[in-house]
Each structure stands twice: as C-alpha cells, then as structure tokens.
Amino acid sequence: MIESVIVLLFFMSCFFLVFQLADNLRAKLLCEYAAGRCARAATIGLNDYMIEKTAHVATMAAAGPCRTTDDRGGTVGYRSWISRAPDYLECVYDAQARQILDFDYWRDGRTTASARLSGARIEATVIQRRPQLFGPAMLFAGPAGDAEGDPGDATLVGTATIEAHYPDWLE
C-alpha cells in the first residue's frame, strides 16, 4: 500500500513537472511571437503605448485568468477575448482598455514591451513574469525569480529584430 502511494506521488510529480515546463514553453513562444508583432508595430510608427497593447493582445493565451467581466457579471470567455481585441487596441486610455480586456499577467507591469531603433533595425523585446509552481516541479525547473519580481517568478523574454526601412522613405 505504501509503495503504491509513493509511486503515485512520483508519477504525479513527474506530470506536474512536465505540465509546468510545457506551460512555460508555450508562454516563451508567445513572448517571441509578441516581440515580432511589436517590432512590426514599431516599423509603422506606433507609439510605446500601442506597442504595449500589441504585446498584450499577442500574449492573451498565456496571460493568466481574465479579470474582465461581461454584462451579467461573469468572466469573459475565449470567443469574447478575440472579439474584444480590436476594441482594446483602439482604446486611447488605459482605464478604458482595462474595461474591455484585463488579464492577471498584464497587471503591475508583469507583461512589458519595448522597441528601439538601432541603426537600420528595430529591436523589440517582450518580458513576461510568471509565477512558478512550488514543490517537486520547482526542483527541476531551474532558477526562478529576478531582482525586480517576486522570488517565485520566472522571467520569460522574447526578442525580435526587423529591418527599419521607413527612415529611408521619410528623410
């Protein structure tokens, strides 16, 4: 009986480890995708706030629970996320944007985006801080945390570089 419990705990620990690693890999891929979208947004001259919103929309699938409520007070579902994304991108003010879409990892600067012109290139970076699971999965997941975040946070960074042709045309 004890052996069965030990084996069950071992398999559950292995499952949670693989689940956490897969979730972090998915979030890392979405950060890379978001960085590419932010770099494209910067090439057409969008400001920093629009680049940040572009990163938010690109990382919706890995942004944690949705905090926006619908008209009846319930949480907004996946189909509503997709239909609300254009309205979110059109918002001018942050308070208005949070009424349309708001996720856990968008709050408190957990998902940030930046783009800068470097010579003839635009380099975009998307950073997302995500909480790590504690317990056996944390032993195998590697170091977690950074100087700015909680010690239980993992920092995922996505970067992209795109050639900037607009300086040639706008001179």
Give residue spans per PLM region:
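Alpha-helical assembly-interface signal, strongest on the long, hydrophobic N-terminal helix that forms
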Residues: 1-68
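Short, conserved structural patches
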Residues: 44-171
